[in-house]
Amino acid sequence: MAFCSASLMGQSVKTVSLELKNGLDKDLKDVPVCVKIDDLRAGFTVRSAKVMDSMKEIPSQLDDMDTDYVPDELAFVVDMPANGTKRIEIELNSERIVRQYPQRVFATMLARDTKKGKHAEIRSVTVPGDVNFYNMIHGHGPMFESELVGYRIYFNAKQTVDPYGKFEKGLELEESKFYPNDEQLAKGFGDDVLMVGNSCGVGALKGWNGEKAIHIEPVAFRTERILAKGPVRVIAEVKVEGWEYQGSLLNMTNRYTLYAGHRDLIVDTYFDSPLQKEIFCTGVQNIMGTETVSYSDHKGLVGSWGRHWPVTDTVKYAKETVGIATFIPRKYVKQEVSDKDNFLYTISAVGETSFRYYTMFTSRKEKFGFENSDSWFGYMNEWKKELENPVEVKIIY
């Protein structure tokens, strides 16, 4: 039976099936699955959901994507066998039922009182474009992580994605807040592993002036927020309103999604109206120093591997080795370019109101990571193949 519905004492319940198909000749772990609630045709406002893989309940989450307090998407991760299929059962409920799952991701944004040394949890902040709010947020922006990696997004015109590397898999940012103390470092905590400077860091979207990447300015307003906090995925957003760029006035949202078990970010960029001929760019940082090597397939995939100090304190902290990768689908790629800080592709999406690309990093300190640039660049190509051949999701009505 594809689906069934029931209504008991005012409570509505509906079960819907998904058919998942992996077309690759390899097992896949923690495959992200996201379905629109509207596409499930519940016939009522969904307040909770339960996802079953065979006879086992698996962690999932409902996310309110437009902040109207009504769930819009259901997300979970699932393992898939090579060349295999799975049938997933989803029970939708009109009542709010709290389900406890292991927290495999974490996100936070903290306003700080520098005089009192205190922090307050916040979900969203909007400031005029000419206001310097960078140091008013602990960590300079939203911070989020999976078991593998951590990230933060700078609350300024750079809007750079900055990485946090780990020795061991696990969640650390709730405790370390991106700045581990000496005791935490002695326990094996990770920390900031890259000095991003004026670069795009790990795949941040930038403007392009024909010669180099430029920051997102001037703008009328800038907003950063945490949209989803787990247990399966975290979503952070950066929104600018009134960006004066290449003769246009743009309202743009960059949405970063990180799933459990993943190091890669899904980067969705949205605009209020169709794009014209604006040219943007993204890619990977040309890591400072003389030890950086890069790789490109000249078809939207670019990576770098290098070693440099992550902070200005070169006495307390050692040089860090970092690998970065970004993949842009070919339909958006205009040209492969570079400047002194970055290896890049320019991007155009004429007539579109959104586009998607992907980015990730590794730190050499990872005990579960990559030995050298060759292994990293090899993994990049495997990653691209998986992205270009996603698991098929079919709703069975």
Regions found by a protein language model. Give the residues of each.
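Acidic (Asp/Glu-rich), glycine- and aromatic
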Residues: 252, 263-297
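Bacterial Sec-dependent N-terminal signal peptides
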Residues: 1-15
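Alpha-mannosidase-like glycoside hydrolase catalytic domains involved in N-glycan trimming
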Residues: 11-116, 127, 131-132, 139
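Beta-strand-rich recognition/accessory modules
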Residues: 66-80, 324-397
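Short, well-ordered beta-strand segments enriched in hydrophobic/aromatic residues
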Residues: 16-22, 148, 254, 265-273
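Solvent-exposed N-terminal domain segments of exported/luminal and surface proteins
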Residues: 94-217
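Extended, loop-rich substrate-binding clefts of extracytoplasmic carbohydrate-active enzymes
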Residues: 186-260
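Solvent-exposed beta-strand/loop surfaces of large extracellular or lumenal domains
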Residues: 47-73, 244, 288-305, 326-332
